[in-house]
From Swiss-Prot:
Any one of the GO BP annotations: cellular component assembly
Keyword list, A-Z: Cytoplasm, GTPase activation, SH3 domain
Function: Rho GTPase-activating protein involved in the signal transduction pathway.
GO molecular function list: GTPase activator activity
PROSITE patterns found in the cross-reference section: RHOGAP, SH3
Residue stretches of biased makeup (Pro residues): 461-471, 625-635, 725-734, 807-817
Protein name (database record): Rho GTPase-activating protein gacII
Main localisation: cytoplasm
Organism name: Dictyostelium discoideum (Social amoeba)
Ranges for domain SH3: 238-298
Length: 817
């Protein structure tokens, strides 16, 4: 069947109006003449060509000669290069229809928006081939000339970008040039022309088949071989676009529409002037709208269209094709061995070969072949030097055929051999087998590994042994007799930093599950702490109680709280050897002593913190890193888990030794009155738990007791004292003398007895309270600055102005009035 592919019998008459003379141009003769003259006179090396304006008189003379049918340009010299270049732009601009027809304009703009450069080149190549014969010939002539300018762009200073900016408005423009539309698509038009100039060698490959021929033989349907799932290389005609239907269309006898369904693959035979297509499907030809289909690449049809590569000598291997969905995950492969062992217990891997595409999506201008090719997935045995691969040895399954990824497998005495490249997707045990079978003639010797009888599983190295978990009964069934813990087994592995790390990590994970094993030394010592501890001779760490697990909360029941806290009385003593035993194996260490745990209710929680005379509080914190070697190891108390369930608690802290001096005493005698601290609210953070309570102070050695309680802010007692070792306070604000008012302070209430109970609240006499309310005094409970002489006078200030100015509160009372 012979059919005209392009309507070449109808040649458009391009009308050019020059000096009111209508000139009929049947062929792009004048464009060809101008391009040949410019090429012959060295225009490709002229700087600023097509950018510098030419002589107006010369340009008008050339236009007049063309209008009269005179095409002799021999009288012009190289001095007229810019004039000839200006005439070329003028002729292209004044054509009634550009060489890229208006119907093709939206398609070119749409293709330019593609992100894949290889697909963009393929579509541009096919669209230019679909242009009318006259326009296609003119495109090849013009862009073949412009491509030479890009070669000599160092001399003419005209890059492909500059040339595209000059010629895009003349050759690729819409029919109705609206301002918004032109501004939006101007850059896309420039991009299309720039691509055509740069990739002209690739696009001009079409010219070999169709430029000089007006009719070609078209096959209605591409022959499809069901056995090989491929089409022959000779049967693929590259002169056609392939489209995929996105909207179904029914047949119509009047319009001769092509019937198709959504998703059908349609071969586009011709692009009409109105922008619609003439397509073919299943031997039926008809019209279809360009909005009903999407132009696709041949590489997207890999399932139905796969080209067969040139024949390659292959080895005789079995053709057992198995299909398994691929799994995606990352794994590591061994660099010393090219074979990977898989067992039946491990998940099977899918051997997926990356596509090697020499088709439209991977074309380059340097390719001489005009037919896109798609290479099938080749076997690494067929071309071992072309495709790096990792072959597999798969142990036989219980079934006749192994359920392995899709690939070609060959059964040998050692298992099934896969001849396809593989992308590893699961971590694999790379253990080397002990026995190796002799090489055979039908497979490579480096892959012949015997099947192992033992199951190789992917797991971590064995962790050090640990004492068995201690079962703690509920609080309702607590035994009366002590329970002895089993002696801990010695560690079988040397105490290397790596083993210590695994041991430490494993115990950290298990400590949140079972709180009975939190006394293990690995929970407290860091991975490198054995170096430091072993360097100190006769050093020991005493652990008292059990660290509270982070999984317990304040909302747990009372039974679980008492059961978890019943392990707090257990004591562990780990004695470490001297520095000489650092590198000795742990199996030579004596077994750890047996510890006795008595499950009795714990005493009320009490935190005792030692405070020195320099008012610095020493806080001990259990950390995973050892202290610096210069400091001795402190006794680390392990707090009870029951702290996480308490709402309030009384914490006893002995205060520093403070000498209280009465200011009004001239003999500088010790005033028996003590410092009274008031805390309206406070909270103590311990082990990610909030504890609140009432703070009281113990009696210092040789002193009197100090008590505190929750007091009303308006009934706070006052005090006058000097406290040493306090930071200096900024001087008070200088207030004018006329605004100062002085009023004596009431004496603070005396304690009922210096030997009162520790938790007894301070009772203010009723008469003293009434007196304070009558005087409307607000007592500030603030320590005075050090080295301040307050003898004689008390300054009264305004609390409002003091707060606004952010001044430190005075060490005396004041009246708001």
């Amino acid at each position: 069947m012979v059919r005209k592919l392009f309507n070449t019998s109808h040649k458009k008459e391009l009308i050019l109006d020059v000096d009111t003379t209508i000139v009929k141009i049947g062929t792009p003769k004048n464009v060809v003449l101008l391009t040949k003259w410019l090429d012959a006179n060295g225009a490709i090396k002229e700087e600023g060509v097509f950018r510098v304006n030419g002589n107006t008189t010369t340009m008008e003379q050339i236009k007049k000669n063309f209008s009269q049918g005179k095409d002799d340009l021999t009288k012009y010299t190289s001095a007229d290069i810019h004039s000839m270049a200006g005439c070329l732009k003028f002729i292209l601009r004044e054509l009634p229809e550009p060489i890229f027809t208006w119907d093709f304009y939206p398609i070119f703009i749409k293709i330019q928006c593609l992100q894949d450069e290889s697909r963009k080149l393929f579509f541009l190549k096919m669209l230019i081939h679909g242009l009318p014969y006259t326009s296609r010939t003119l495109v090849f002539q013009l862009f073949g000339f412009l491509s030479k300018f890009s070669v000599h762009q160092d001399q003419n200073k005209m890059t492909p970008k500059n040339l595209a900016t000059v010629f895009a408005p003349n050759v690729l423009r819409p029919k109705k040039e609206e301002d918004n539309f032109q501004l939006m698509n101007n850059q896309d038009s420039i991009g299309v022309i720039e691509t055509l100039i740069e990739e002209f060698q690739y696009i001009s490959n079409i010219q070999k088949n169709t430029l000089n021929s007006q009719e070609i033989k078209v096959k209605s349907v591409l022959p499809f071989d069901e056995t090989t799932n491929a089409i022959t290389q000779q049967s693929l005609v590259e002169d056609y676009l392939i489209a995929k239907a996105n909207t179904p269309q029914e047949s119509s006898s009047f319009k001769k529409n092509l019937p198709f369904k959504k998703g059908d693959i349609i071969k586009l035979l011709y692009i009409k002037n109105d922008g619609n297509f003439i397509g073919e499907i299943n031997g039926i030809t008809g019209n279809l709208s360009q909005t009903y289909v999407d132009i696709i690449d041949i590489s997207e049809l890999a399932e139905a269209f796969t080209l067969t590569p040139p024949p390659i000598p292959t080895l005789p291997i079995a053709s057992t094709i198995l299909h398994t969905p691929p799994t995606s995950s990352s794994s590591s492969s061994s660099s010393s061995s090219s074979s990977i062992l898989l067992t039946d217990n491990q998940p099977k891997l899918c051997s997926s070969t990356p596509r090697i595409n020499n088709s439209p999506s991977s074309f380059s201008p340097s390719l001489s072949s005009t037919t896109p090719q798609l290479l099938v997935q080749q076997s690494p045995r067929q071309s071992p030097r072309q495709i790096p691969s990792i072959s597999l040895i798969v142990e036989p399954n219980n079934t006749n055929q192994p359920s392995f990824g899709h690939g070609t497998l060959q059964r040998t005495s050692t298992g099934y051999f896969s001849s396809k490249p593989l992308s590893i997707s699961q971590p694999i045990n790379m253990s080397k087998p002990t026995n190796m079978s002799p090489p055979t003639h039908h497979a490579m010797s480096m892959h012949n590994l015997p099947p192992s009888n033992t199951t190789r599983e992917n797991h971590l190295p064995p962790l050090p042994t640990k004492p068995p978990p201690l079962t703690i009964p509920s609080s309702s069934s607590l035994p009366t007799t002590p329970i002895k813990q089993q002696p801990q087994q010695p560690i079988q592995q040397p105490l290397t930093p790596q083993n210590h790390h695994h041991h430490h990590h494993h115990n950290n994970l298990s400590s949140s599950v079972n709180t009975a094993n939190t006394g293990n030394c690995a929970n407290i010592l860091s991975p490198n702490s054995d170096r430091y501890l072993s360097s100190r001779s006769q050093s020991s760490v005493h652990l008292s109680g059990s660290s509270s697990s982070s999984s317990s909360s304040s909302s747990s029941s009372s039974s679980s709280s008492s059961s978890s806290s019943s392990t707090s009385n257990r004591k562990f003593d780990f004695s470490l050897k001297s520095k000489s035993s650092k590198n000795s194996p742990s199996k030579n260490l004596p077994p750890q002593p047996t510890t006795t745990s008595t499950l009795t209710p714990p005493p009320p929680p009490t935190i005792t913190t030692t405070t020195t005379t320099t008012t610095t509080t020493t806080t001990t914190t259990i950390a995973t890193t050892p202290p610096p070697p210069s400091k001795p190891l402190p006794n680390i108390p392990v707090k009870d888990q029951q702290f996480n369930t308490l709402k309030r608690s009384t914490i006893e802290i002995p205060p520093p030794t403070i000498t209280s001096t009465n200011i009004n005493n001239n003999n500088n005698t010790i005033n028996p009155r003590t410092l009274n601290y008031s805390f309206s609210s406070f909270s103590i953070t311990y082990n990610n738990s909030q504890l609140g309570g009432q703070l009281s102070q113990e009696e210092p050695p040789g002193g009197v007791k100090s008590q505190s309680s929750y007091l009303d802010n308006n009934n706070l007692p006052s005090r006058n004292t000097n406290i040493p070792n306090l930071p200096p306070r900024p001087p008070p604000l200088n207030i004018p003398q006329q605004q100062q008012q002085y009023k004596p302070l009431p004496s603070p209430p005396q304690l009922q007895s210096p030997q009162s109970s520790l938790n007894q609240s301070l009772q203010i006499p009723l008469q003293q309270q009434q007196q304070v309310q009558q005087q409307k005094l607000t007592t500030h409970y603030i320590l005075p600055p050090q080295n301040t002489n307050l003898s004689g006078k008390n300054l009264q200030r305004s609390s409002t102005s003091m707060l606004l100015n952010k001044l430190p509160p005075p060490p005396f009372s004041f009246n708001k009035n």
